[in-house]
A protein has these predicted regions:
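Activation segment signature within eukaryotic-like protein kinase domains
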Residues: 129-130
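Activation-segment/catalytic-loop signature of the eukaryotic protein kinase fold
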Residues: 88
Length: 232
């Protein structure tokens, strides 16, 4: 999730199509993130996360195209180490993605809390988290279409805030919002950096073409930060 996102001061629960938005978790520069619930015909409740494009961006064709690409990429990915996408579409004038709710914290939050206590994340935990992240990336990097052709998926924004750790110990990669894949219809403009600069590979920081190895480089920076408590 966007590291700049800040929870707004107030929120009134609202009905959004079949989703009842319980709480607004964060608002970034491009979208709002909500905790929501849905009801089955039998009356069962299911908690989910809704990512909804900000109203003023809904008329931006380039951005909507990028958002739809994110949904197409994410829906095609089914792996234990990736946040699962359930649905995407448009309700009234709002585009949205419905995804798995991971009850837990992201690595950025975990490291910040440890720093406040002047403690380091135990080495075995750091290695476990990095290993699980690499499993998820390996799956995404090797994903093919129905014809067996590589999709060429690259996350491009691997950072502590996009690594979620559930209270039960699951590790999941979030936010393929700026992922690059051959199936994408939206092309990043030349010279425009996508991702968080401090976790970028050298080629990504220079605005050059990125590869799947760029994601792995970013994971190495995350692992360094988890082991040392310091940014590289």
């Amino acid at each position: 999730m966007d590291s700049q996102a800040q929870p707004p001061p107030t929120f009134q629960p609202e009905l959004f199509g079949k989703y009842f938005l319980i709480d607004r978790v964060a608002t970034g520069g491009m979208a709002e993130i909500f905790k929501a619930k849905t009801y089955s015909t039998a009356g069962f409740e299911k908690l989910q996360v809704i990512k909804r494009i900000l109203a003023h961006l809904s008329d931006n064709e380039d951005f909507v195209s990028m958002f739809i690409d994110e949904a197409k990429i994410s829906v095609s990915l089914q792996h234990a180490n990736l946040v699962q996408i359930y649905d995407f579409g448009k309700i009234r004038d709002n585009y949205y993605i419905a995804m798995e709710l991971v009850e837990g914290k992201d690595v950025k939050q975990i490291l910040r809390k440890l720093a406040q206590k002047r403690k380091l994340l135990p080495e075995e935990f750091a290695i476990f988290i990095a290993h699980e992240v690499c499993k998820g990336l390996d799956y995404a990097h090797k994903k093919t279409n129905l014809q067996g052709e590589p999709l060429g998926i690259i996350h491009r924004d691997m950072s502590p805030s996009n690594v979620l750790v559930s209270y039960s110990g699951e590790v999941k990669i979030a936010d393929f919002g700026i992922a690059k894949a051959e199936m994408s219809t939206y092309n990043t403009k030349d010279g425009v950096l996508k991702g968080k600069f401090e976790y970028m590979s050298p080629e990504q920081a220079r605005g050059e073409d990125v590869t799947q190895q760029s994601d792995i480089f970013s994971v190495g920076i995350i692992l360094y930060e988890m082991l040392t408590g310091r940014r590289l």
